[in-house]
Each structure stands twice: as C-alpha cells, then as structure tokens.
Amino acid sequence: MKKLIYLWLLASVLLAVACTDDDDVFSEESGVRLQAVIDECNTTLRGAENGWKMVYYPKVESYGGYTFLFKFGTKNRVQMISDFDMSEDTDYSYNFNTSESVVLTFDSYSPLHRLADPQYPAPDYSNKKGYGVEGDFEFVVKKVTADTLYLVGKKNRVEVLLTKATGEDWLLVSMMAEMSSCFALSENERLGMSVHGVLMASGLVELDDIYNICKISYKDEEGDAVSVESPYIMTDKGCQFIQEIEVAGIKFSGLNVDLSEGFNNREFVSNDEGGSIRFFIQNFAPLNLTRDQIPTYVPNKNIASVDLLRTTNGNDVR
C-alpha cells in the first residue's frame, strides 16, 4: 500500500514539473512572437520618410473627425501635430506594451489625449462631463503592412488606420490648425446668417470646436423652425461635413472661411457653387450706450446686443 502511495506522489510531482515546463515554453514562444511584432512595428513606423497620417472619427455620426500626423523616431520619441493644435512643442513619447496582444500607446499628454479628456460637456450625454470625445490614446495593433497599420482603440474599440503621410500633408494639417482657430467663438459670439445677400433674422449657427459639430437653426418660408446639424472635419479652407446638408433650399457639404475683412470680421461661406449662404460673427456683449443713444445707433450686423437692447427697452425701430 505504501508503495502505491509513493508511486502516486512521484507521478503527481513529475506531472506538475512537466506542466510547468510546457507553460514556460508556451509563454516564451508567445513573448518572442509579441516582441517580433513590436520590432516590426518600430521598424515600419520609423522607416517612413514623411511619417504617418491618422484621420480619426472617435464617434462617427455623433462627433466630427480629427487629423493627426506622426513622425516616429528613436528612443520612443514621436513628433505629432493635429488639425486643432498649434503648439510649438510637438515632441511626445510613445511605447508598446503587451497588455492586449501588442498595444501602441502614446504615454505623454498630447493632442490625442484631448479626445479622451473628460472635462468637456458631451452632447451625446446631455452635456454632462466625464465622457470627452470618447477617443483613445492606446491602440491595439491588428495588422501591419508596408504602408498601413490597422489599429483598434483599446477602450472605445473604434477602428482607425495609420497610413503613410506625404510632405504635403504636413503643410495641409498646419493650415487646418490655423483654420480651426476661426471656428473657436468667444462666449459672447454667435453666427448670424444671410442667404443670397439677404439677412435672415431668425438664422443662428452654433459651432462646437471641441466635438466638431455645426448646428444651423432658422425659420422657413412658412415660419416653421428648422434645425440642421452635422459633424465636420477641418480642411485647409474651412470644414467638410460628414454628409451633405440642406439649408433654405440650398445644398452644400461644408464651409469655407472668408478672411478678406480680417479675423474679427471673418465669415463662413457655404461651399455650393454660388457661395449662397454666409454666416457672420455677431457679438452679444453689452455696449456702453445710454437709453437715448440706442434708437439712433447705426445698425451693424456684427453687433447683435444693440438690437436686443432696443427690443428690451421698447425702442424697436426695425
């Protein structure tokens, strides 16, 4: 009986050792494979003369898109620019880890992190904070080819591509970043609207330059309220909507920025053939006018606060 017990114990020990050896072998093989993928990624990323381009829609059809350019270098450094950030400091760090297969992570705060920043009120969640644009700064590498890396956001699971960039891309994205500053309105600024040169008093445009959303409200010929909304992505001339929209019977797919009168008097022009609709800055900040000055103030389409004062004080002379 004792011999049987000893034999059983010996078999158990040998089995445990065998299993441990197998686990080590498989673990080692897996680690080697993952390191090979990481090496391939680094070689591919660092070998692109003009770097890489990412056109990223974190939540397509809800929010707009964003364009990034990357130039990967040694010592895990990466040069990064975007279509919304004009910072002179473009040097950041990146790394690979194996938390989920192979993961490309940008591990210093960069423009990519803004898309995951929870401080911004989210339109899809009744403007509550805590969600951000629902972007990622960690991406699971699914496939690597000579000119494309196929990625999936680690948290939000949105597929995105890294494709080889051109020298022209760097110029265009810099121009997009300059254009994006035109879409940032101050607290007291709104956009008024004219169609074929005729002012539409009911027209109002809201630009959300964090989530890249354009919302246009107006009244049609029957006096019914109409609201049209579209996410957009920046271009070197203005913005492009994700789909064509129709406003006051005019179809267009984006806005071009007119800076001919200077930045403060910039206008946004529909990109239909005739540039039929123009959106202009209106300032709602209070003016230091006396009651007697209000009725005689010369109208200015860019200063809406005067019209508000006239109506409020019973001096509406329109």
Model-derived features: positions:
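Sec-dependent signal peptide recognition
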Residues: 2-10
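C-terminal motif of bacterial Sec signal peptides marking the signal peptidase cleavage site
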Residues: 15-18
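Acidic/polar, low-complexity intrinsically disordered N-terminal segments immediately downstream
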Residues: 20-103, 168-188
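A short, compositionally biased
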Residues: 47-48, 73-76, 145-146, 210-212, ...
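Short solvent-exposed loop/turn micro-motifs enriched in small/polar/acidic residues
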Residues: 62-64, 87, 132-134, 225, ...
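Short, structured motif recognition centered on aromatic/hydrophobic residues
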Residues: 70-78, 151, 268-269, 313
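Long, acidic/polar, low-complexity amphipathic helices and coiled-coil-like
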Residues: 77-221
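Preference for solvent-exposed, low-hydrophobicity sequence contexts
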Residues: 155-159, 164-317
